[in-house]
Amino acid sequence: MPMQKEFRTSAYHSRFQTPFRRRQEGKTDYYQRKRLVTQHKAKYNSPKYRLVVRFTNKDIIAQIVSAHITGDVVFTAAYAHELPRYGIKYGLTNWSAAYAVGLLVARRALQKLGLDETYTGVEEVEGEFELTEAVEDGPRPFKVFLDIGLQRTTTGARVFGVLKGASDGGLYVPHSPNRFPGWDIEAEELDAELLRKYIFGGHVAEYMEELLDDDEEKYKSIFKNYIEEEIESEDVEEIYANAHEAIRADPSFKPTEKKFTKEQYKAESKKYRQQKLTRAERQAKVAKKIAEFKAQQE
């Protein structure tokens, strides 16, 4: 059968609807967003809260967000660049750091709500699958839904590290264990030991030992900062364990200290800003150039 050219008639163009701008730009999955945002129709002022997780090249962003008619409102947020304050100075975008960010945003949100003592979460992490359950005589746990945006839901992805951290931190995040590292598809069981290894940076320590044996030059280039700080593979688990304790002790937000004051920044920027000339200065500049040109001609 010969190929027929598709003709777009006037009826096609008159009925064509352009997608939303953020859909055209490939930024928002509206099919997903509609289901994450739609509130219960029989309840008044009960927004759905989303645990929004996004990754950049050097940072992890975790926010608890609710949708309103005027726009999304961020209830609280946590970032991987805050982790050095808790002792995690390097590897701020790996799976273990993602777990720590999830734990931080959970503890920070519960502290803000005054539920941090009611819902302590999982204090002794063993890698088991656990959901936060409601206490008998008290408020229900704070419920959030994971919002991964356009990221792929690959088994073992870092986004589920943030989910696990938030769940262990005391938030109620509905989920199943089949996307965590250590999930066996055939047996349909979770290897808790493997998941615990990822939470405490065991996979990083394992890679350090492997590189040290096989390729010492590569080890020195990749783990240069670890060598300077005299951190060995045996110390990695302790670093993350201490960080989790520190996060639970004080999850409150503290702004980063600026190197200079606003006045100093302003004075520095003025050094490189070109000043606008007055009319008299421009005329004098032109007259000078004319005089120089005439002098060359003579």
From Swiss-Prot:
Pfam families: Ribosomal_L18_c, Ribosomal_L5e. One of its GO terms (cellular component) is cytosolic large ribosomal subunit. GO terms for molecular function: 5S rRNA binding; structural constituent of ribosome. The keyword Cytoplasm applies. GO terms for biological process: ribosomal large subunit assembly; translation. The keyword Transmembrane helix does not apply. It is found in: Cytoplasm. Component of the large ribosomal subunit. Mature ribosomes consist of a small (40S) and a large (60S) subunit. The 40S subunit contains about 32 different proteins and 1 molecule of RNA (18S). The 60S subunit contains 45 different proteins and 3 molecules of RNA (25S, 5.8S and 5S). This is Large ribosomal subunit protein uL18.
